[in-house]
Amino acid sequence: LKRWNTRLNGYLLELATTRFEQALFKSNRVVRLGDIVKLEDSKRVPLNSRDRDARKGPYPYYGATSIMDYVDDYLFDGIRVLLGEDGSVIDESGRPILQYVWGKYWVNNHAHILAAASDYSLEAIYIALQRTPISHIVTGAVQRKISQRNLNKLKLEMPDAKSLEYLQDIFAAYRCNCEENRGLVSLRDALLPKLMSGEIDVSKIDVAQLNSHLAEYSTVLGKLFPLSTLKGTVM
């Protein structure tokens, strides 16, 4: 199930990108990133490893590229786009290292925090950034860095905002799948020690019934998101 959700999310992002490209073909304009987002970098608070060890909790602690830890409090609540500020800031194709995040979480000082500040949703901005090479705004030979000034001046090709309303449904499904995966991981971590110790007797599990439930779930998802409509799209 986790593997299916991950695969489905890949298709969803491909679909979102393809439809974004189609909207650009019909209508597009160049905008400065600083005109359509608000940077919330001033709200960031870094915690060193000792601080984090003393503050273990349920809230994700994000760095430049991924979740680094979990802590007992949060600084942000809601959807944001994180863009690596220093270190690993671009991929092999010169595009930015991005994280699409939601819920309650903490962010350190190695990621720029983008909040929506225009008619364009963060989902639209996330897709636009994913397809935009940004090597020209990266400075530093030893330690790569993207300054706030350079980031605000970054130019993006954007279609008409109203043509991107479909992104809300796609990303709602994306978030739902991610949350389900997190729940599956938590369930695995809780059950595995009991299975290994013999506390849970697997001989009493009805495998046929379990397979039936999984097959039914797969059929429902297949009807919602037919793979024939997703294959062949370009990320």
Model-based region annotation:
Residues 28-29, 50-52, 67, 72-76, ...:
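Short capping/connector residues at structural and topological boundaries
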